[in-house]
């Protein structure tokens, strides 16, 4: 769901920082 996509996006952003 949207929560899964949001969580995945957060992980992606964190991995780039």
UniProtKB/Swiss-Prot annotation:
Subcellular location: Secreted
Tissue-level expression: Expressed by the skin glands.
Keyword annotations from UniProtKB, A to Z: Amidation, Amphibian defense peptide, Secreted
Organism superkingdom: Eukaryota
One GO process term, biological-process aspect: negative regulation of nitric-oxide synthase activity
Gene Ontology cellular component terms for the protein in this record: extracellular region
PTM annotation (Valine amide): residues: 17
Its job: Inhibits the formation of NO by neuronal nitric oxide synthase with an IC(50) of 40 ug/ml.
The protein's name: Signiferin-4.3
């Amino acid at each position: 769901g949207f929560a899964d996509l949001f969580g995945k996006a957060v992980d992606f952003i964190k991995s780039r920082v």
